[in-house]
């Protein structure tokens, strides 16, 4: 198996960031101001999308590494030069056994590398919309894979097709699995609650989009959110969150409305997290200092029945016991919803036929 890059130190992340900048005296095509600094996109090389400008790997929060592991996302440090956003960033940390069988076609002929430094988003717009006065609708898309696997640059997330049709399209990476949804008594003691870090990332991303998308040609007052499979869970739970301050009144939910099933209670989530530590051979009362110092790959054990991958009703980010209850309480009454089912949904869970091998 190809060795995967795992970036764990914030200092290393900042070194990588500085290495991606260019001076202000060089090419200034497709340069956009953001709240953190200037970013530069590239023209798409895909046939039929030559007018599309892509911004790949735009930071929306500080790398959640080191002392920021299992904490709410923080603002990114500002930069002075131009950040060239021409390359897909590493996907969030996850068990690759669920990702690799889908093949390189699904991953747009890439071999996904992974990193805890994953709080980036991608934007597709057009040259005309970058410079025009009329602001266009915005679509924010969340990938599938439950809350444990996946990434934004798989074949299912074709942002350029939206951009070509005058929609400013955005896809968002967020923490997954043990890095996004671990709940522990010692974490709750530290923060008042624990888990739901991936959901916190989503909300942080929407706040960044609201603040900055106009500079990419998007209308911050006309944002639609959607997702595929597990992305529908992300989208609906985010809209129902009391912490979600960005107004969104349109949802596109591919592969169903996630209205069934209750969230874990905070207590049950903490018990599950403690059991997961024991599955890893760790003491249940290990300190957060020790946990945050561990290598990220040592924390991955998705075969465990206790692997963290569910949101919990913490009373702060998740207030309702289920999305169904949020629907019953009228949370979605003013939200227009387009829903359908995707061909091949859940196919990786099925046993392939001989012809499919």
Where are these regions (language model features)?
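Sec-dependent N-terminal signal peptides of Gram-positive bacterial secreted proteins and lipoproteins
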Residues: 4-23
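Non-catalytic accessory segments of hydrolases
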Residues: 22-196
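Active-site loop->helix "elbow" adjoining a glycine-rich segment at hydrolase catalytic centers
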Residues: 144-145, 197-201, 229-232
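Alpha/beta-hydrolase active-site loop
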Residues: 192-214, 271
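Substrate-access "cap/lid" subdomains that shape
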Residues: 211, 245, 254-357
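Alpha/beta-hydrolase fold nucleophile elbow
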Residues: 216-228
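Catalytic nucleophile serine of serine hydrolases
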Residues: 227-230, 255
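Short glycine-enriched nucleophile-adjacent loop
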Residues: 232-244
């Amino acid at each position: 198996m190809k060795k995967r890059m795992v970036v764990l130190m914030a200092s290393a992340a900042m070194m990588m960031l500085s290495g991606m900048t260019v001076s202000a005296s060089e090419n200034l095509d497709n340069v956009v101001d953001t709240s953190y600094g200037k970013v530069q996109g590239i023209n798409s090389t895909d046939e039929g999308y030559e007018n599309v400008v892509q911004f790949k790997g735009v930071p929306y929060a500080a790398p959640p590494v080191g002392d920021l592991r299992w904490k709410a996302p923080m603002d990114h440090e500002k930069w002075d030069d131009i950040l060239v956003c021409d390359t897909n960033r590493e996907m969030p940390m996850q068990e690759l056994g669920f990702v690799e069988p889908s093949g390189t076609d699904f991953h747009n002929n890439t071999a996904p590398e992974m990193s805890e430094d994953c709080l980036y988003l991608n934007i597709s717009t057009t040259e005309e919309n970058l410079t025009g006065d009329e602001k266009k609708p915005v679509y924010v898309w969340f990938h599938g894979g439950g809350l444990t696997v996946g990434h934004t640059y798989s074949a299912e997330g074709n942002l350029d097709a939206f951009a070509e049709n005058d929609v400013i399209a955005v896809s968002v990476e967020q923490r997954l699995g043990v890095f996004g949804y671990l709940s522990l008594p010692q974490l709750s003691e530290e923060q008042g609650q624990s888990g739901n870090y991936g959901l916190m990332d989503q909300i942080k991303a929407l706040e960044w989009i609201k603040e900055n998308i106009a500079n990419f040609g998007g209308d911050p007052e006309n944002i639609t959110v959607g997702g595929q499979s597990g992305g529908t869970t992300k989208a609906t739970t985010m809209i129902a969150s009391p912490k979600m301050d960005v107004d969104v009144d349109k949802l596109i939910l591919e592969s169903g409305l996630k209205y069934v099933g209750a969230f874990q209670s905070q207590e049950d989530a903490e018990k599950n997290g403690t059991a997961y530590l024991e599955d890893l051979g760790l003491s249940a009362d290990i300190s957060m200092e020790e946990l945050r110092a561990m290598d990220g790959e040592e924390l991955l054990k998705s075969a465990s029945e206790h692997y963290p991958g569910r949101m919990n009703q913490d009373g702060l980010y998740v207030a309702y016991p289920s999305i169904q209850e949020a629907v019953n309480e009228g949370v979605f009454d003013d939200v227009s919803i387009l829903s359908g089912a995707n061909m091949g949904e859940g196919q990786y869970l099925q046993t392939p036929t001989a012809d499919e091998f």
